[in-house]
From Swiss-Prot:
Its cofactor is Zn(2+). One of its GO terms (biological process) is DNA-templated transcription. This is DNA-directed RNA polymerase subunit Rpo10. Its main location: cytoplasm. GO terms for cellular component: cytoplasm; DNA-directed RNA polymerase complex. Part of the 13-subunit RNA polymerase complex. It is an enzyme of class 2 (transferase). GO terms for molecular function: DNA binding; DNA-directed RNA polymerase activity; zinc ion binding. Keywords: Cytoplasm, DNA-directed RNA polymerase, Metal-binding, Nucleotidyltransferase, Transcription, Transferase, Zinc. It comes from Saccharolobus shibatae (strain ATCC 51178 / DSM 5389 / JCM 8931 / NBRC 15437 / B12). Its EC number is 2.7.7.6.
Length: 66
């Protein structure tokens, strides 16, 4: 869905790093190097960014009106 605001494990703020991360990775940079440049050092935070799949555009079609 949408990237969580904080890491599930340590509580560190990660949402502010999502857009620069995905932009640079889509441009062809190495994800590990991008995370290092953004200051994401903990492996729990790194996995939150590396393993996230943004599927909100697919799920939005299945919502029903309230």
């Amino acid at each position: 869905m949408m990237i969580p605001i904080r890491c599930f494990t340590c509580g560190s703020l990660i949402a502010d790093k999502w857009q620069p991360f995905i932009t640079r990775v889509n441009a062809g940079e190495n994800p590990g190097k991008v995370l290092d440049d953004l200051g994401v050092k903990r492996y729990c935070c790194r996995r939150m960014l590396l393993s996230h799949i943004d599927i909100i555009s697919e799920v939005i079609h299945y919502t029903r009106p309230i």
